[in-house]
């Protein structure tokens, strides 16, 4: 009889470690449950530019008739959050698809999967770009398998508060300047932006405001960006995530919604404040459980950003330079300033 061949203690430990690493990379914990939300394997890289593959595993591309139209955020193995204005009523649900695990939109990768859309739920209060209720839920036609490139982000609970000055990250494949598309192979772009209080944001949007086109920062909106401009979001990535870190966990603090031109001074990006829709989310998707956000950082007063900023002016803007209101957003990542120089 042939002798039985077994593993020694050291070999068993090594195999166990390898199995655990494999489970973590596949998005499954050792107990067989799904990956926890808001966790990333790639280390965080601050600033702006091209992201690393798998750095923002909840980022999705929403396509219509095969063309990228919006971003979105994976929040479970069946649901994606995006902006309501990405889904005009005249558009057919069957023409939408969701691309997950993508890094370069123009390059094929085994890590990328495409799902059709089974259901689209938009908030009933949404009316037009710039109005409240700019949030939508998309149910995938079949559950997605988590991996190191496909993982969910955490939804914040209703009482969640993200402090002014907190550096968050907006991501997407949008234009790099007004009417200037991201060049092939269109790698995912990232931009770190500080949060701005609603009061200061309203103050900034009243600078050089056009009376016929008022800017209203609603209670369900969140602002982030730079007062001097040059780094912002632009056309093409509405619906994408504004991801904010709290104690090592990433939360979907905002959804790219609207803005006044791309990278213009005194015009930070405006996002749908996800936490204000926690009860609406639970009503429509009971299986999703928003997560309590730890309050470990105090908000920094930021009124000086408006009242004493050198760009401040009470004069009306020249008509030829007047920006377009309520523009769907995507990332400029500072390239806007270079584009303007030419």
From Swiss-Prot:
Propeptide: 30-32, 323-342
UniProt keyword Transmembrane helix present: yes
Residue ranges crossing the lipid bilayer per the database entry: 320-340
Enzyme Commission code: 3.4.21.-
Alphabetized UniProt keyword annotations: Cell membrane, Disulfide bond, Glycoprotein, Hydrolase, Membrane, Protease, Secreted, Serine protease, Signal, Transmembrane, Transmembrane helix, Zymogen
Keyword presence, Lipoprotein: no
Active-site residues annotated for this sequence: 85 (charge relay system), 134 (charge relay system), 238 (charge relay system)
Matching PROSITE patterns: TRYPSIN_DOM, TRYPSIN_HIS, TRYPSIN_SER
InterPro entries: Peptidase_S1_PA, Peptidase_S1_PA_chymotrypsin, Peptidase_S1A, Trypsin_dom, TRYPSIN_HIS, TRYPSIN_SER
Membrane topology of the entry: Single-pass membrane protein
Pfam families: Trypsin
Signal sequence annotation: 1-29
Disulphide connectivity of cysteines: 37-154, 70-86, 168-244, 201-223, 234-262
GO MF entry, a single one: serine-type endopeptidase activity
Residues modified by glycosylation: 110, 159
Broad class of enzyme this protein falls into: hydrolase
GO biological process, one term: proteolysis
Subcellular localization: Cell membrane
Domain Peptidase S1 per the UniProt entry, residue ranges: 45-286
Stored CDD domains: Tryp_SPc
Family: Belongs to the peptidase S1 family.
General function of this protein: Possesses a trypsin-like cleavage specificity with a preference for poly-basic substrates. Stimulates epithelial sodium channel (ENaC) activity through activating cleavage of the gamma subunits (SCNN1G).
Subunit (UniProt): Heterodimer of two chains, light and heavy, held by a disulfide bond.
Protein's recorded name: Prostasin
Provenance organism: Mus musculus
Gene: Prss8
């Amino acid at each position: 009889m042939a002798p039985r061949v077994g593993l020694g203690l050291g070999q068993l430990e090594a195999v166990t470690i390898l199995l655990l690493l494999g489970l973590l990379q596949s998005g499954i914990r050792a107990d067989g449950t799904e990956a926890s939300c808001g966790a990333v394997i790639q280390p965080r890289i601050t600033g702006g530019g091209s992201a690393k593959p798998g750095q923002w595993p909840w980022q999705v591309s929403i396509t219509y008739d095969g063309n990228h139209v919006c971003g979105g955020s994976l929040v479970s193995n069946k649901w994606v959050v995006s902006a309501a204005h990405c889904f005009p009523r005249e558009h057919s649900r069957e023409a939408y698809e969701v691309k997950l695990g993508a890094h370069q939109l123009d390059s094929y990768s085994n890590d990328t999967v495409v799902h059709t859309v089974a259901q689209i739920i938009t908030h009933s209060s949404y009316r037009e770009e710039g109005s409240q209720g700019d949030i939508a839920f998309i149910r995938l036609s079949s559950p997605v398998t988590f991996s190191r490139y496909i993982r969910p982000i955490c939804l914040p609970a209703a009482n969640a508060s993200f402090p002014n000055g907190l550096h968050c990250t907006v991501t997407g494949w949008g234009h790099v300047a007004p009417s200037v598309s991201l060049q092939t192979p269109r790698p995912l772009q990232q931009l770190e932006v500080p949060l701005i209080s609603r009061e200061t944001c309203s103050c900034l949007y009243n600078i050089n405001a056009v009376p016929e086109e008022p800017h209203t920062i609603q209670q369900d909106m969140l602002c982030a960006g730079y007062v001097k401009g040059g780094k912002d979001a632009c056309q093409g990535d509405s619906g994408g995530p504004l991801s904010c870190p709290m104690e090592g966990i990433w939360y979907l603090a905002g959804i790219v919604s609207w803005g006044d031109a791309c990278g213009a001074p005194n015009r930070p990006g405006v996002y749908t404040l996800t936490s204000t829709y926690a009860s609406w989310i639970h009503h429509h998707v009971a299986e999703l459980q928003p997560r309590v956000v730890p309050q470990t950082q105090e908000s920094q007063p930021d009124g000086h950003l408006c009242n004493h900023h050198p760009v401040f002016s009470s004069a009306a803007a020249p008509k030829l330079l007047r920006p377009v209101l309520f523009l769907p957003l995507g990332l400029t990542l500072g390239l806007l300033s270079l584009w303007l120089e030419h």
